[in-house]
């Protein structure tokens, strides 16, 4: 009996030692590429790396799925809450939020387009935005990624 308790404890211990960024390790190849690309850009400007936020990823996934389904690239689709509403429904707390969306065949093209766009680039390099959730869903027109950034709520 004592050995079985030790075995159970030894089996469960690694679960509790998993870092909070583990969710980011379950990303698709395109999502991981977009996450890493944003952090490379931030690192090149001596900005802290973005931290993965699963609530943001849930909201991004729902929005990216809708964009892919309707074959539209818009910040708010018909019948959908605005960004603030989507994040609130996903359980995210924030004081500042931003969203980058696009459609293209691959993550390199998407990231390059975001970096060439002043508004999207500003979101990626904003030092006040410290967390991110990303979803990239394959649709008829290509990958429809949604990247949502936030600054945690101060309350």
Please report, for each region that a protein language model flagged, where it lies by residue.
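Bacterial N-terminal signal peptides that target proteins for export
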Residues: 1-10
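Short, well-ordered surface patches within globular domains
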Residues: 24-87, 127-128, 132
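Bacterial N-terminal signal peptides
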Residues: 9-18
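A well-ordered secondary-structure block
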Residues: 82-154
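Sec/Tat signal peptide C-region and signal peptidase I cleavage site
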Residues: 19-23
